[in-house]
Amino acid sequence: MAGKTFVYVGAEADGLYRKEHNDSQWTKLSKGMPPSPQVRAIAIDPRNSSILFVGTQRGVYRSKDSGESFERMNMDEGRIVWSIKFHPHNPEIMFLGTEGSEVYRSDDAGANWEYVSTIINQDSVQMAFATRILGIGIEPDEPQQMYAALEVGGAAHSSDGGKTWEIVNKEFDGDVDLMDLHGVSVGGPGAKSVFISNRTGVWKSTDRGQNWQDLNFESFSDIRYSRGVETSPNDPNTLYACVGLNFGSEQGGVMRTTDGGDSWTRFDQGVNALSTTFGVAINEHSPEQVYFCTRKGQVFGTLDGGNSWKEHVLPEIAANVKAIACTSG
């Protein structure tokens, strides 16, 4: 399997799929998973690409064999997992975020999970679902500095490794378009900036959320509703952001910046995305390999930094795609 590139996709309908870049078909991965799995988060162990974690409607599951089989990890019952994040320097430490805005931590590589805190924002916008943590960001140089993207509650910052949280919504309070956060990533010069995505595009803070700068996506793209945002593992100034017209639109794409957010260009040139792009994944072993998924189940990948693209057609039953990850095997 050396030298091959594998991509994993998670959907709310029909669970988890895996595909090698050059294969013609996807493999459904369900052994040991809960019935009718709803997969909303995927994280691959940075030390061993055969180990992956998926967040489901019944907690977090781990595979040690590239998804061939799974086992449920030890955590509180009834938790819907929306985000999973490894500590930047110690992969034994992991964090996850749930529906209900709870933060859990593992100190033994994901085997056992302990409740840490609940992020409370009294000004969260009331929706048909409980406020949930769609993304977790961690500063690489000061990993006790953490960030959370709340749908629909804005941004939160922790300075003590997730034990306590401060809502940092100075520019957002009261505006549902700004409070509806979908992703968070740490990057920029020296990896000291935090980027969040919402209905209006991507915003940036250089002072840990005390102030936010609108990066003016409307200057660079005619579609700016943003979902996932990710930093390249080898260059903190390079970030990718998923965009569409709105949640249910029939257009999608990926924006890229190489200067820490000052300017953005369309990365997915020549790609015909027929719904809003929800997730983007960069292969940390080969950062020129980038994949993205759309809400209605299209998956596109490039092995050469966007010069050429290949579409990986998911089975029609895989709908409401929410998560994507890729690695070398």
Where are these predicted regions, by residue range?
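Extracellular glycan-interacting surfaces
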Residues: M1-G329
